[in-house]
Amino acid sequence: VASRIDEILEQARAKLTRLPAADVPAALARGAVLVDIRPAAQRASEGEVPADFPALVIERNVLEWRCDPTSAARIPQAVGDDVEWVVLCSEGYTSSLAAAALKDLGLHRATDVIGGYHALKKVVA
C-alpha cells in the first residue's frame, strides 16, 4: 500500500512533463527559468548550481508568491502564465510538488528536473 505522500507525489507528477537533467541546457537556451528551491543549508552542503546553469534561488516557502504574475511579491521574471519554470530540489521529490503547485496557479509550463540537483551536477561533470 502506497503512503499518502506517495499518492500525492504521483498526483503531482501526473500534472507535469518532467525534464531530464540532460535537457536543462536546451530548456535554458529557449528561455526557461531554472529555480533552485533547496534551503540554504542544503545548498551549502551539496553545492550551488553550476554557473553554466543560471538558477534563481527561491526557497520553497515563498515560491508561489515569487512566481505568480499577479502577486505583489513576484519577481521580475514572473511576467505571465507562459513562463517555463523549471524547479530544482535535491533529488526531484519536493520539486515535483512545487511545480504542481505552480501549475495550480495557472503557470501551465511549470515542471521540475528528474533527479534534482544530484542529476544536474552529473550533466556538467
Please report, for each region that a protein language model flagged, where it lies by residue.
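Rhodanese-like catalytic fold shared by cysteine-dependent sulfurtransferases
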Residues: 1-33, 40-85, 91-125
